[in-house]
Amino acid sequence: FAEHCPDVDILGINVYGGAPVIPAQLLEQGYDGPYVMTEYGPLGYWEVDHTPWGAEIEQTPDQKAAFYKRSHLESVTAAPDRCLGGYVFKWGHKQERTDTWFSMLLPGGERTPSADVMVELWTGEPVANQAPVVTDIRTDLKLARVDAGVPFDAAVVVSDAESDALSVEWDVRPEGTDKGAGGAFEATPESLGHLVESADGLSAVVRTPSEPGAYRLKVYVRDGNGGVGAWNVPFFVNDP
């Protein structure tokens, strides 16, 4: 890089899974000049495992928050004499493969654990009331091929630092088919919330859709204080 681009004043880098190794990689390429992390965040959907039918498997909120923190510490603050700063993606809401993949905030401004961890890194102080942290959805639907019209139990595994009273919203949506490239707009799949037959506390009963194809079971856990934990698991409804 340094051989072919000797006159670079400042280098801007968009990187996700590889963010923690950027300082070392730049030196290996012969570049010891200033750089800016112009995009970093969770693992990209091009960097994760897929289901057999091609659905990308999203990191859990706790995994995302940990990776935002690691990327910041190892690519931004680890090289203060070279890194001029960075921009996390995305301080806002965006449908890109899912509505939560890169969204650090939900449409109403609710903070995810990823937002909370970045606030603490930037200010040195934790947020006053931390968002719920979802670590799993326990269900036989997860990553499974299933028949149409069958009820399944589901339960979200979540913790809340302040032991707030939590409200839980379940949803089912088709896998997005409007898959853009380079951050292009993607339409949000229509909710099939009527398939949530019952919900009680952290648990729900969900009936699989009647139409074959790829879907996601989604959960949003809110603490009533501006925080939310949200995740999803893919599943596939078989042909009759």
PLM segments and residue spans:
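Extracellular and select intracellular beta-sandwich modules with Ser/Thr-enriched
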Residues: 227-233
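Distinct, well-ordered alpha-helical segments
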Residues: 1-5, 22-26
